[in-house]
Amino acid sequence: MILTVTMNPSIDISYPLDELKIDTVNRVVDVTKTAGGKGLNVTRVLSEFGDSVLATGLVGGKLGEFLVEHIDNQVKKDFFSIQGETRNCIAILHGDNQTEVLEKGPEVLEQEGQDFLEHFKKLLESVEVVAISGSLPAGLPVDYYASLVELANQAGKPVVLDCSGAALQAVLESPHKPTVIKPNNEELSQLLGREVSEDLDELKEVLQEPLFAGIEWIIVSLGANGTFAKHGDTFYKVDIPRIQVVNPVGSGDSTVAGISSGLLHKESDAELLIKANVLGMLNAQEKMTGHVNMANYQALYDQLIVKEV
């Protein structure tokens, strides 16, 4: 079973409009509300793929209750309740544009953060792989993910970590390393303080920087150009076919689902990389975020090429 961790989930609200009118009333007929957050996208895709998954994280208030109730009933859930209220994230879809209004979310009390570590530690006993995704809520220290990784390391559970900015920097500078990280070029540039291109020779050099020492897998998305990956001392390039992209949001989370599944099933490097890329591509072909149509899985799988470089 895979444990997904979403520390800052949200209720994702979609307001479709023909036109967004400023400084007046806009009436919405078809409102969509879903349980949101990067980790919950991972959860949905794993469930649709057929893997056993347990979802955890922090929820609070009536919105937190709504969120838990609106996670697929087939998914096991064990969230930790806090005093603060789970946030709303609003997307206004008008014409070909999307305007987002994102609430900051709750401020987590210090004791709540400590108590969740104990909650997490107990959940580790019943899972084989951990996937940690998304931002940290206010109130938690920037190195909080390093604490989760430390507990998972102590329990012998591999960790797929998908975060960015200061939270990722803190983990990389910690002695406690995740098994997998999946930065994109922009995030690599931010971490290193210099521009990083998609040139394969440059990426090889970058992924051997001291900052990334101790990370078993580093998987870098190159968008339509596929993926570059480092596993131990071996480098890979994944070539992908061109597809019709409907909604790319959530494709990174679907990729995390594939990586986590590959670790769970102890697949070969090539199998893990292909699965991860296929799930990311399947998500991009769907209107709904964090959703894959498994009927198209094998056709895409057969088109991907993994090369050692």
UniProtKB/Swiss-Prot annotation:
The source's superkingdom equals Bacteria
MF terms per GO, please? Answer: ATP binding; phosphofructokinase activity; tagatose-6-phosphate kinase activity
GO CC terms, sorted:
cytosol
> What GO biological process terms are annotated to this protein in UniProt?
D-tagatose 6-phosphate catabolic process; lactose catabolic process via tagatose-6-phosphate
Give, as one word, the top-level EC class: transferase
InterPro entries named among the record's database cross-references: Carboh/pur_kinase_PfkB_CS, LacC, PfkB_dom, Ribokinase-like, Tagatose/fructose_Pkinase
Classification via PROSITE patterns: PFKB_KINASES_1, PFKB_KINASES_2
What catalytic activity is recorded?
Answer: D-tagatofuranose 6-phosphate + ATP = D-tagatofuranose 1,6-bisphosphate + ADP + H(+)
- Associated pathway: Carbohydrate metabolism; D-tagatose 6-phosphate degradation; D-glyceraldehyde 3-phosphate and glycerone phosphate from D-tagatose 6-phosphate: step 1/2
Family recorded in the similarity comment: Belongs to the carbohydrate kinase PfkB family. LacC subfamily.
This one is known as Tagatose-6-phosphate kinase
Q: Which gene encodes it?
A: lacC
